[in-house]
Amino acid sequence: MVHAPAKEAIPLLTPYKMGQLELSHRVVLAPLTRCRSYGHVPQPHAAVYYSQRATNGGLLIAEATVISPTAQGYPDTPGIYTQQQIEAWKPIVDAVHRKGALFFLQIWHVGRVSTTDFQPNGQAPISSTDKQITPDDSGMVYSKPRRLRTDEIPQIVDDFRRAARNAIESGFDGVEIHGAHGYLLDQFMKDSANDRTDEYGGNLENRCRFAVEVIDAVVAEVGAHRVGIRLSPFDNYMDCFDSNPVALGSYMVQQLNKHPGFLYCHMVEPGMAIVEGRRKITHGLLPFRKQFNGTFIAAGGYDREEGNKVVADGYADLVAYGRLFLANPDLPRRFELDAPLNRYDRSTFYTQDPVVGYTDYPFLEEIDEESTTTYA
């Protein structure tokens, strides 16, 4: 089967200059937890997975990677705090760079989204609060957290700083600070999860202080031109939401703008609406896009049509794709040809298999070869 390139202009596939970095297209691999880094050490199969999704001039954001032993909350997620982990990332980064792609590492602390099983010496997870996450429908029960003391916070800030330095040592082109989805920085920023009475709680400025200190430290360590952040002000995930998400997002963007050359702001859409029977992205990020001085990346359920539209309209510079990129290693090529997409298998998202649901999703050419094969 021969696929002809789509005739209409494809905004997602136009070049873009992000700071001093030249991108050949706007389709970004979103950071996706895959739980295949055994013992929290990146494995050789990750080099296959990421290089499959790498294109010349493309941007990949690696899966959320823990910054310290207390940052863990899921099985077999990678770390970036030991020399063994730093060395293990190097061949993975090299494999991506050989394809001509840019590679950023998302640095992460889960906070209270953890259990004592994942914590050093079985201690309680740390958070902005001592309030436990309400058990969800899956039956997962997270341990009751311990509220961080004020004098402990500088150590966590330094853990982020060292993680950024280690990422650059591994060869990454930069880092993305994980400030989204109900994890530690989000727990401090959002008023549903921050009930502190010290300088890290109360008003908006205080609640954002920890995240701002992390940003400042990481920028000072590796340079603003190597730093992005992911934020989800509208998110209600892991009992973590804010009473005024627009004010929260706007304040954080203002803090990013204080760092000339801060590379990108990666934000998650508020959600979906049903319009004429179709799921439509609500496009609630426009105020932040207008305020931010750097590259703006939008994420949250985008398909080819929606991605093209927001780039063409100037709503976003780049669009991050998660599940579609997971299931289609050649996603930019498929978008170019407007070709059918592989369906993702949710049951294999977080298994530990190094191949199934990880590196075995077929490329378009493989499907075409199968469809034209005849058997005697």
Curated annotation (Swiss-Prot):
Substrate binds at residues 178-181. Coiled coil: none annotated. Its cofactor is FMN. Its EC number is 1.3.1.-. FMN binds at residues 31-33, 64, 106, 230, 301, 322-323. The active site is at residue 183. GO terms for biological process: jasmonic acid biosynthetic process; oxylipin biosynthetic process. It holds the Pfam family Oxidored_FMN. CDD domains: OYE_like_FMN. InterPro entries: Aldolase_TIM, OxRdtase_FMN_N, Oye-like. Keywords: Fatty acid biosynthesis, Fatty acid metabolism, Flavoprotein, FMN, Lipid biosynthesis, Lipid metabolism, NADP, Oxidoreductase, Oxylipin biosynthesis. GO terms for molecular function: FMN binding; oxidoreductase activity. Belongs to the NADH:flavin oxidoreductase/NADH oxidase family. Putative oxophytodienoate reductase that may be involved in the biosynthesis or metabolism of oxylipin signaling molecules. This is Putative 12-oxophytodienoate reductase 2. The gene is OPR2.
